[in-house]
């Protein structure tokens, strides 16, 4: 019986959305968005992250001003308990995603390990 890998992927999507970790992440994200101060700080934090990533991807140097802004924004974010909670929930979700990725990659790793033996 052939397996439709895309059906499995959609089942995984649904399963992820039903995990306590994802539900907690949704709740934490909603709390940040419902608080104007936390929302503004979080959006600024994300904007700075994107700016740094874009510079890295295009080979641009990250100047001192960008570093200073990033440090200031990071400090502000660390002082906001709603954002700290959100980041903790993101980390828990990231652990799950990394575990899933490891599992998904196992067939390829097994293939190449067998081929190298």
From Swiss-Prot:
Q: What is the lineage of its organism?
A: Bacteria, Bacillati, Bacillota, Bacilli, Bacillales
Organism whose genome encodes this protein:
Listeria monocytogenes serovar 1/2a (strain ATCC BAA-679 / EGD-e)
List the NCBIfam families. PRK13676.1-2
Q: What is the protein's given name?
A: UPF0342 protein lmo2223
Q: Which domain of life is it from?
A: Bacteria
Quote the Pfam families the UniProt record gives. Com_YlbF
| Family statement drawn from the similarity comment of this UniProt entry | Belongs to the UPF0342 family.
């Amino acid at each position: 019986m052939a397996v439709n890998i895309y059906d499995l992927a959609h089942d995984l999507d649904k399963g992820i959305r039903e995990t306590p970790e994802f539900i907690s992440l949704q709740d934490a994200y909603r709390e940040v968005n419902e608080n104007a101060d936390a929302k503004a700080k979080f959006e600024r934090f994300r904007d700075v992250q994107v700016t740094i990533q874009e510079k890295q991807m295009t080979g641009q140097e990250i100047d001192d001003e960008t570093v200073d802004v990033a440090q200031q924004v990071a400090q502000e974010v660390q002082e906001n308990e709603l954002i700290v909670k959100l980041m903790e929930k993101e980390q828990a979700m990231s652990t799950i995603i990394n575990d899933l990725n490891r599992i998904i990659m196992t067939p390829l790793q097994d293939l190449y390990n067998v081929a190298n033996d």
